């Protein structure tokens, strides 16, 4: 084939016809072109090549000679900076090289790789070209280095040309020059798999058989022996190790000797050779403590292992982690090596563990070699051996998901209920690896899918952490709970949201995972918070669509709930405080009422005494100066005793009736006796007893009251000679004497008890009553009654006179007061006695408190007044009167008595104001209780769910209307009664002002107008019959719905006027 066609077919482009003529060897055409255009002799194509170069490539010596004669440049370079001589040396064309060298070609010219024609000439087997170049080169130019710092000798060793090496060494080439990798020509000569490389090695070693040359290490620490062992060239290894200076145990940078490489590569013969020529007698180990036997066992070279085990210097030593070559072989699943070692070494411990507690079975289970596991189990390997992490081989298999190994171990007796040092079970490790099949196998072997480790994490959380959907599905299909929290409060949804596994989140929510579970730490993050922190936008959107909340939203909701609960607590607390306040006011009102009754009794006694002094001062003087003569008891008086029949006394029967005129005609009575007998009438009992007091209070005990008609029957014949004037004087003196005796005379037995005659020896002398008798009038002391019997004649006469006296409170029979007629000159107190309970309350304070005055409180008030008079320094009395006698108040100066009365009035006025406020509070409280009771009654009706509110409002309005009308009709109007004439308007205004001022001090606002608003009438019939309205005094009903408020409807008038009507 024509060369031009060959060049063109290969894609070369000739720049001109001169290149074509050079390639084709058309010498005539080439000369014509050059003659016609001399510049064409060095014309370059696109590769920078000249016609001369193409002549070299095409082996056109004639054309080349013609171009050289025409003046072509012999050292012209192409784009790779190569000349025609480089191309001739590369092709090994001796003729062209000789032609170009004779034309003064530059043999030191370097191309882009810095290679000279000398480097290129070493690749050919013939040394002629190399010898031609060496003839033209100086002695120092033979070691010219290329870009990799390699000389021609390096290339000769690399191409395994021993003749070239001898020729270069003969021209003084340096055999110890390292290249860029630190290799000398011996390294390149030993790095041959061809056994003929031994000649090049010998050629170099013969030139300089030094120890440094044999043990020269490159920059990776490898000697020529390392390269010879790596290539498995037994001949070169034999040559190298034949020198005594060769170091067989030399380490490279990986701390591996030539024996390690021979064992790793499985060169059994080289291993045997090296073991035999190892003069040290020890087997070196690498940086990990592994011996060549470890490498041979790991690489599954049974023959090599056999060579090692058969050598007496080899032992199965452990590496730095305590692992033997047997463990290495088990970890790699090298059953042949294991069988070889078990057969050759009978003392091998199959259960030997490394420093982490792992055995050969651990290594085999971790790698998943079922055959190796069976082999070890057949050789009595311990199936439940634990390492330092308390992992058994089954744990390793579950972690890596080796299903066959797991089943083999379970069949071999491995326990499935063990946990490691962190509390992880086999199911935890299977879930961490995402092995759904392994999880199913373990669950079938009765492992709880909700088992928790020491941190509280479940296998489901481990699977959610890795986003293993299949494993999560298997666990939840086997009743794994997705809402279990670990000790930090995280659930499986927390881990899935943290890592952004949307599919896992969907799966968890499908199995009823709670999306708002909070952590237990300080942040209290929810799964949505983890998604927000990780900026998982798709997860955030999906969680929000399924009702997920962040911790900030939950805190807002919790704050709202807490505020609502706190408001309810404050309302209940205010209710309890107001209730306690009202109960305290109620107790204060009761105390004030008791004190008021006591002061009222004192006031009445003082008014009676003042009235007596104003109406009859001379008579009081006479009665006080007249001697009291004892009168013997009369048989008629003894026989005229009658039993007073007790009965209920009217509420306002305190009017003092005039005595019967027949009393003045009693025989055997002198004026002194008459005044003395009449003076035992108790003024205090007349004025201060309760209006509603029953006859038992008047007549209980051994000394009950005697009806005044007993005087008419027994003493009418004895009082014939006595004038009416003397009788009146005696009666007035008797009244004065009773005032002097004070409260002691009020408690003296006046007449015989009801139902039995009085004893003749009964003592009638006045005595001071004890405190217990004053406080408990309904429990008379029998010992005092027996001790009060008469022991002398004077006492009997006194008792007889007391029997002839009428009862202070009057008899229960309507006709018992016929003989008693009030005198015209008696005190105004007896002329204006209150007629009813309401008028009496108006006289006291103008407030209907609903509590009647106590008789004992009145008596105690009178006694207090008596003690004040006796102890006053202004009266001049050093000591009180002796027991049985009373001091006459008329003996005191008028100014002193007025001062005492004024002081009592001021104190009672202050008490009256307090009592008014307490009465208003009591009325409000009773109103609230009544409304509450009515609301409870109305709710007991069995009505429909829709009609309950309307019917309740109608019934409540009707009841309130009826009740208010009954109260307005039946409440008696209070009449102000007093002995002194006062302005009604002034008294009522003062009372009203005192009432509102006290309430304003308590509540801070006026209570005017409360309970006086009309309620809209209803046409519904009455559902409750009000049997007794008068018994509920001072109670004004209001809207029953207001009872839920905590002010007990004590609202200011501005609010009460605007309240809605039913």
Curated annotation (Swiss-Prot):
Consequences of knocking out this gene: Constant reversal of left/right polarity (situs inversus) and cyst formation in the kidneys.
Composition skew (Polar residues), residue ranges: 636-658, 676-689, 713-724, 1046-1062
GO molecular function terms listed in the Swiss-Prot or TrEMBL record: calmodulin binding
UniProt-listed CDD domains: IQCD
Record domain IQ: where: 555-584, 914-943
Source species: Mus musculus
Keywords of this entry: ANK repeat, Calmodulin-binding, Cytoplasm, Cytoskeleton, Developmental protein, Hydroxylation, Membrane, Microtubule, Nucleus, Repeat, Ubl conjugation, Wnt signaling pathway
Protein name: Inversin
Classification via PROSITE patterns: ANK_REP_REGION (PS50297), ANK_REPEAT (PS50088), IQ (PS50096)
BP GO terms, sorted: animal organ development; embryonic heart tube left/right pattern formation; epithelial cilium movement involved in determination of left/right asymmetry; kidney development; negative regulation of canonical Wnt signaling pathway; pancreas development; post-embryonic development; protein localization to ciliary inversin compartment
